[in-house]
Amino acid sequence: MSFRHFKRRLDTSSADESSSADEEHPDQNVSLTEKSTSLSHSDLGGEILNDTGKNRTPNDGQESNESDESPESEESSDNSDSSDSDDMRPLPRPLFMKKKANNLQKATKIDQPWNTQDDARVLQTKKENMIKNIDKANQVAKNYETMKLRLNTNYSTNEELIKQCMLLDDNDEVDSEKERQKWFERQNERKQKHRRIQLAKQRESEEYEAKRFEAM
């Protein structure tokens, strides 16, 4: 009985000392408890990570395979979409724009370098066009001058005729015998002219008949 009583006293004394130590150093006890809890949490986290790593290894392989296959499927779908879009794409309507010769030559010089033959050909065409334009202008000026001269000459001839007509003396009472003699002379000239014309016609008809008779 005395031994039990002594052991109980020792237990109570150790408990009192521990409680007094706890009261004297509360911060140390709190830090120790925090360290123990952190260690327990870290151990639990490591175990969880190991478990998840073991469980997720096949899934990761599947996901990598799916990620490897996904670009190929996307490329194939893009190719099919692009081919369909190329087939179904409407053709643009052609637009014909008019440009001046100078602008066209500048654009072609900027876009592509010309050869010496092309330059010579262009210069030749320019020269020919210039010569044609000059000839055309000269022809127009010449036609204008000729028309002007014709008008002037017609006007001058008409004026001269009018002057000559005004200078004619048609008064027969001044010298009637002389006027009558001139009239007879003009009449004889007309008769002789008519006779010459008739003789020429008769001679032609006789020659025609003679040729026709020889042909028979």
UniProtKB/Swiss-Prot annotation:
MF terms in GO: RNA binding
Extent of Basic and acidic residues compositional bias: 177-190, 201-216
Any Gene Ontology biological process: mRNA processing
Compositionally skewed regions (Polar residues) per UniProt: 28-41
Highest taxon, organism lineage: Eukaryota
Biased composition (Acidic residues): 63-85
Quaternary structure and interacting proteins, as annotated: Component of the 25S U4/U6.U5 tri-snRNP particle, a subcomplex of the spliceosome. Interacts with PRP38.
Function comment: Component of the spliceosome and rRNA processing machinery. In association with the spliceosomal U4/U6.U5 tri-snRNP particle, required for splicing of pre-mRNA.
Family note: Belongs to the SPP381 family.
Name of the molecule in the record: Pre-mRNA-splicing factor SPP381
